[in-house]
């Protein structure tokens, strides 16, 4: 619900976005993405995922059309894999951004113009 509410949390996320320079990209780690492997999203345009149920329609209508960055995703996968094994991190081109990511980012960077990896 924080995605559509105004409260101390959403105000803090908004203040964070205003107080910091626009980042090159954002890497989100979400507890809502269950995989059998470590993976990072690697598509140009990740879709907004509504991975929840029983909430007001307003929440299901929200979209966070931030771009992805496949080249950066490859770099992240390589860096993480270097500490484990070269193929330890998969590049995922199907998932998108779940509400663990976009419900926060919609307040910090509402223009959705910062590339996001998850």
Predicted regions, residues:
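A short aromatic-anchored loop/beta-hairpin motif
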Residues: 1-79, 83-84
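Internal, conserved structured core segments that host functional sites
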Residues: 72-118
